[in-house]
Amino acid sequence: MKISSKKKNEPKIFVSKPLILDIKKFGHSFYRADLEFWGIDHSGPSYEGRIFINNNKANSKTRMTIKNSYVGSYFIFGHGKCFGDIGHCEIRKDRSPYDLRPSHPLTPAYTYITITDQLLKIGKNTTEFVVTIVPVLASGTLGEDEEDVIKLDKIQIITYNK
């Protein structure tokens, strides 16, 4: 994965490594396709993640149309700066499976968007899908880490058979 930024103080744009999926092999054997995002770090500012497939030139001014390979957005309500004591925002990894308390508020997030129609259209011409996420910061985020907004563990395409 590659992260780039064109202007100073503009959030870096996330560009994934290619995801390989041969849509032609599947034909119409699936009824739904989701783009999943695992391990999203939401300790920074709130933002909209605008998602484009096979358009690594997308930026915050790119129109959100299928012609521009826009497939949807996800929204992160960011935690922002921590004003707690030392260790306050550290996520404990040694929780007991019998611990009934809610997980730590900064536990990495998961989200998905359904991209069935867009995937079928884009997949007619390629087996490689590069995901570009353009972060658009919510207002009032001054003073936070505005550059390295998108941090995540994994992106994958999931299809559901009929």
Residue ranges and their predicted role:
Residues 1-162:
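Intrinsically disordered, flexible peripheral segments
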